[in-house]
């Protein structure tokens, strides 16, 4: 249930032959039959159900019950933004007088601005890389009773920092 979704595309290509209106370097039409395309996409966040209590999300084998805060799907993830670009150039390859081929060479860059788009969060904090367990006052006795509490905190923070909570770069 994404409420708002925007997409814009800008495409510009130089022509060939007499239609070419681009730069000429050393007598050559360097951008002849070349083009650029930029695509911008943006969207409002999707819903999730916020929980009121902290649970141990990154530990396996732990079955904590979560308590709903607010209404079902009453919270929203942040907006997402992505800018991508594609540059291309066509080349004509003449094999013989009657036989020729077209070759299109392009470079495509996804997520040009390297935006960190959040696609999932921990329901208690609304944060993509912290479930709140390590700083929860109620969890401190359990954490301090571990064989090595500092090691537990370090390894738990690694497990909570899940790259799957972000879109691909």
Name each model feature, range by range.
Residues 8-10, 85-87:
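Membrane-embedded beta-strands of outer-membrane beta-barrel proteins
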Residues 17-20, 24-64, 78-82, 89-169:
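C-terminal beta-signal and adjacent terminal beta-strands/loops
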Residues 70-74:
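Extracellular loop and loop/strand-boundary signature of outer-membrane beta-barrel proteins
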């Amino acid at each position: 249930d994404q409420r708002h979704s925007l997409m814009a595309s800008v495409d510009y290509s130089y022509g060939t032959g007499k239609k070419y209106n681009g730069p000429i370097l050393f007598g050559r039409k360097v951008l002849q039959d070349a083009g650029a395309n930029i695509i911008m996409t943006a969207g409002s966040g999707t819903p999730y159900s916020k929980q009121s209590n902290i649970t141990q999300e990154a530990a396996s084998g732990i079955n904590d019950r979560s308590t709903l805060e607010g209404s079902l799907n009453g919270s929203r993830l942040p907006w997402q933004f992505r800018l991508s670009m594609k540059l291309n150039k066509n080349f004509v390859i003449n094999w013989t007088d009657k036989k020729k081929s077209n070759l299109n060479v392009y470079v495509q860059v996804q997520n040009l601005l390297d935006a960190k788009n959040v696609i999932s969060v921990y329901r208690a904090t609304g944060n993509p890389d912290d479930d709140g367990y390590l700083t929860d006052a109620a969890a401190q006795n359990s954490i301090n009773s571990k064989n090595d509490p500092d090691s537990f905190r370090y390894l738990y923070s690694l497990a909570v920092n899940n790259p799957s909570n972000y879109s691909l770069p």
